[in-house]
Amino acid sequence: MERLAIREIIKAVQGELICGSQRGEILGVSIDSRTIKKGEIFFALKGERFDGHDFIQKAIDKGATAAVVSRKKIVATKIAIIKVSHTLTALQELAKFYRQKFNPVVVGVTGSNGKTTTKDMLQALLSSKYTVTATLGNYNNIVGLPLTLFEISPKTEFLILEMGTNHAGEIKRLAEISLPQMGVITNIGATHLQFFRCISNVLSAKMELVQLLPRRGKVALNIDDTHLRSQFKKIKQKIITFGTDPQADVLANNIVISRPGEKERLSFTVCVGRDRKEFDLYCLGRYNIYNALAAISVAKEFGISLSLMADVLGKFKFPKLRMEKLEYGEVTIVNDAYNANPTSVKAVLSEFVSSFPSRRKIVVLGDMLELGRISRKFHQEIGKIVATSPIYSLIAIGEDARFIAQAARNCGMEGDNIFYFKDKKVASRKLKELLKPKDAVLIKGSRKMGLEEIMKYLS
């Protein structure tokens, strides 16, 4: 981060200096007193289970130069204390101010599934030619995205921002802060329905990104997604379509999936106009072709050749917890515990079954969270799929995961092979009892379930 004068910060956040001096400058921004560094400004954010105001003294002790607060009564100190109405809004406004000091090409990436992988692929492609700053991990929300903006430097030519949401208006706010010139929407699925209520509202939330793009902006959209396709005529910006539909601007065909027992590989031809190039992705999950196409759709707009892109993606290392293949003795475990929603679980189950046709298969499935009133229905749908697939055993973990187990039993799966637990440590012991050499195991659940810990319990 480039240095910022405290007087600039006061103006940007429309704050009131209630302690200390407006002279001086800050070297960075922090919201965590545990990791704050000397010279940084501390934003005292409030959450459901914490209040940053309780940690101001700790931040000062670690060398904070200034703090942004929403309380008048603060510990006596010599550092600059800036009072605002809402500290989160102030963080966002400062990020917007800082973003406007630079002129990178900003690309926003959103969608129900595949955001992080698409963002990482695009970062790899653009980094082959440009200096790129991108969202760290999955810092994709109304707190994380502003923190990413502070990573911009004068050398940044491209800024790639993952944009997540579980409420209407959030992506609009993220776009207002970051000012993207190009957008990507990977797909639309049944996510966060506890808040969105229906898929049409999910679509509307994702389309907020397009609405905030400039008239001369560009947007890459999945042509195979019927929800997105319904929006094409409403969009004023240039649309770049990707998918397997022959009408796609960036088309994948000749798709070949490696045979069971071979090294995992997805081979396909990418067609852009008259250009053709063979691509290889070394991973499980056919849906990763769509993630690659989304990234290619953006990179081609900025002069990256298909030949160079094929080379870069052929070396791409996929993020952990996404169809991550692990060996546990003679057992193969596919760890896809990063997150889960009905669309992604159905896709992963299909990939898992087809990838291990001759193996005895066990699936460990956790809750799909934030589905609201129809959560039971969606979990039951997954149970039916498990029961009608060549899966030996099901271990369901959580609260609503019990509906997966119940539906699997009701649809004819052998009851002795169905297990339900609320505790993942207990579930791990049962999994360990079941395992036999050459078994294949799938682990998948929502992020808050933390099912990757099963690997720790197994060992």
Regions found by a protein language model. Name each.
Residues 7-11, 89-223, 227-236, 299, ...:
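Phosphate-binding loop of NTP-binding sites
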Residues 49, 319, 337-413:
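Active-site beta-alpha connecting loops in nucleotide-dependent enzymes
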Residues 104-110, 184-189, 222, 292, ...:
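Short beta-strands and strand-loop turn motifs
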Residues 427-434:
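Short amphipathic alpha-helix with an adjacent loop that forms part of the alpha/beta core around
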